[in-house]
């Protein structure tokens, strides 16, 4: 549901998660070149991994432990994309929860502002895989989050204390307005609230979701009104529920805010009779996701595509990576130009009533490689 909760967007790596856990704040938005008008989708990620990892007798952390600032731009038909990853020791970070504040060197994050820079030389990308290209990026951006996705009990203090999910999610800004300037390899890009189609969220937990899936867009075109919708946004996020040491099948959260009205679907609920089915298929040039969701009040069919050429590979160290062995990495693909359609219906005693068909543009997608065989789950 569209409910802001700044406490859930705060720093939360305490207790066991401080020794084996991660937290990542994500922001993505569209900018336009001041010189040429070229459109480019940028992303920023602030990642903290295992801040209190156990130390060996020689004084070295036994698990990967660092702060990473990742900045870049997704590929497009005219641009090959770029990922810049800068690593810092945990001791270099400063943070507070209320209000949200995070900084490392000249990089700053709060609820209403992002600023910083990353400069990676070609020499720094050599040797062990860092997941970084060479280049420079600098940003100074105002942030105004207008639609949130609140997952209710599934990220509550009780569920967090029970470690009920491998990874928790809070979408404080599934529709976010950004304003500012990004300098990318010497070229200036302007970010405007009306054309940025921004997205901001946070993940934290003891392990990354497997499979990892995120889909989102706030650029939705209505067939009914023949215009782009204003107070509307889509967000889909996977989760891996568990009970004690037992893991269950991966599930999905889905929220569509349609002109201010929320249509929410999660894994089976006895009260809402909610269910979701997912199918994913990888073809030669694109990846396709198909989702059917229904509860007692509404139904939704989502089809979303992303061209593989417009996706960038992102790499993550797992929170349980043992540095005494080879470091295991999670590899995902991400893009900022996904497209598709949403068919939305209201369920009445007499059947389904069509509400609208929406066209999706400039969608965010982050995913692992889909299974070769379609395996829907509910």
In which residue ranges do the predicted regions lie?
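Structured soluble/peripheral alpha/beta segments that form catalytic or ligand/cofactor-binding pockets
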Residues: 1-378
